[in-house]
């Protein structure tokens, strides 16, 4: 086989849909703080919304975002779908997608006059802690605080 003519790792870009759930309190007045809840590996946006609503003050708008990488997880009675944020292959692309998701979401909610851009808080569990800290170090002007549960700061930061 002649390897001279092989072109490797070519790519095309494709649009994907990124999903989130949104809780807007009745008291929201266009200047509400925003808590962005980011689930851990194998979980989903509904789980993280439940957790976020337990910890967020009553006046917070909450957006619970879902990782783009789905997989099956075995349960006692079969399987369920879980989601993750990172892949081993070209992990930097997964990180960039997470950052773009959060930036686009913040822009959308601000344009809809739901949130105050000066009061953005990130709440992550496990795998997403590293992503949220990366986001905060890359965009230090955006989050007012980062809450990490059962996760840590990536070793390369």
Feature map (PLM): residue ranges:
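Short amphipathic alpha-helical surface micro-motifs
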Residues: 1-4, 43-47, 104-105, 129-130, ...
């Amino acid at each position: 086989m002649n390897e001279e003519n092989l072109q490797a790792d070519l790519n095309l870009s494709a649009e994907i849909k990124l999903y989130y759930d949104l809780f807007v309190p009745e008291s929201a007045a266009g200047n509400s703080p925003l808590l962005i809840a980011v689930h851990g590996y194998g979980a989903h946006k509904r789980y993280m919304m439940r957790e976020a609503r337990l910890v967020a003050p009553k006046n917070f708008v909450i957006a619970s975002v879902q990782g783009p990488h789905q997989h099956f997880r075995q349960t006692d009675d079969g399987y369920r779908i879980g989601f993750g944020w990172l892949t081993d292959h070209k992990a930097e692309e997964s990180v960039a997608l997470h950052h773009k998701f959060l930036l686009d979401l913040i822009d959308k909610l601000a344009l809809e006059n739901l949130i105050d851009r000066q009061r953005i808080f990130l709440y992550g569990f496990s795998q997403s802690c590293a992503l949220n800290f990366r986001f905060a170090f890359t965009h230090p002007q955006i989050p007012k605080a980062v809450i990490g549960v059962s996760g840590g700061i990536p070793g390369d930061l």
